[in-house]
Swiss-Prot record:
GO molecular function: 6,7-dimethyl-8-ribityllumazine synthase activity
Record's catalysed reaction(s): (2S)-2-hydroxy-3-oxobutyl phosphate + 5-amino-6-(D-ribitylamino)uracil = 6,7-dimethyl-8-(1-D-ribityl)lumazine + phosphate + 2 H2O + H(+)
Record-given protein name: 6,7-dimethyl-8-ribityllumazine synthase
Coiled coil: none
Organism: Erwinia tasmaniensis (strain DSM 17950 / CFBP 7177 / CIP 109463 / NCPPB 4357 / Et1/99)
GO biological process: one example: riboflavin biosynthetic process
Length: 156
């Protein structure tokens, strides 16, 4: 039996983070968590990290696709927060961000990690951005690093 598993330490990885500006009071914490995980746990060098800000979560997929197509990155991490409000806007933005990023992941040769919070309220978002429920930005960054190594092992 052949079992493929991989570590997250990836010192030579080139990682792009695409982050939504909308709800930046939450997203700043996701970014901090992702950067900490990349540098401290993944041992990724500063010069190998690119951060791209976009207006909102809806713009994450097209930007992730553009980054993936450059060939300059080993993974893309998408970060953002969509909080349910009183209209159907939440369903449209959250759904399109999710399906768009999944499509980019399926059609590119690099991992695209999903670090987009989709919450019912601000409190849930705060909890998932570094307080009671961990930091989903850090988790997405670690997922990207592990997947870089998993795909390398599969293709070896």
């Amino acid at each position: 039996m052949n079992v493929i598993e991989a570590a997250v330490a990836t010192p030579d990885a080139r990682v792009a983070l695409v982050i939504a500006r909308f709800n930046n009071f939450i997203n700043d914490s996701l970014l901090s968590g992702a950067l900490d995980a990349l540098k401290r746990i993944g041992q990724v060098k500063d010069e190998n990290i690119t951060v791209v800000w976009v207006p909102g979560a809806y713009e994450l997929p097209v930007t992730a696709r553009a980054l993936a197509k450059t060939g300059k990155h080993d993974a893309v991490v998408a970060l953002g927060t969509v909080i349910r409000g009183g209209t159907a806007h939440f369903e449209f933005v959250a759904g399109e961000a999710s399906s768009g990023l999944a499509s980019v992941a399926m059609h590119s040769d690099i991992p695209v990690a999903f670090g987009v919070l989709t919450t019912e309220n601000i409190e849930q978002a705060i909890e998932r951005a570094g307080t009671k429920a961990g930091n989903k930005g850090a988790e997405a960054a670690l997922t990207a690093l592990e997947m870089i190594n998993v795909l390398k092992a599969i293709n070896a």
